[in-house]
Amino acid sequence: MSVVKITVGGAMEDEAARQFVDAWHRAERGDSFHERHLAFESWDALARVLTGKRMELLRYVRRHNVASVRALAKALERDYSNVHADVQALAAAGLLDTARGGVHADYNAIETKIAI
C-alpha cells in the first residue's frame, strides 16, 4: 500500500531525520516501499490545505480515473474554478499529481502525526 505520511508542527526536523534513516535501512535491505513524507508547520496550515471539500475530491480521484479538472468538477457537481483552485492547492502540497495528464492521487492512505 502506498502511503502519504504527514507530520504537523513540533519536532518536524527530528521526524524527518528519523524517516531518512528508516528509508536508508529499508533500501539497504532491498525492501520495496512507496511512501511520501510531507510536513506542515502547524495544524492551521494543514487545515487550510485539507478542507472537507478537498478530502472529498481526494477520495474521488483515488477511486476514479480522472482525465481533467473539468471532468472532475462535473463528476463532483462543483464549480470548475473552485475545483481548479482545490486541485492546484493539493498539487502544490504534494497530495495530487497533474504532471502526467489528468489528475492522480497515487496513494491509498494518509497517515498524520501531530506534535502537541
What annotation goes with each model-predicted range?
Residues 1-27:
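General nucleic-acid-binding
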Residues 72, 83, 87-91:
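Basic amphipathic alpha-helical segments that dock to polyanions
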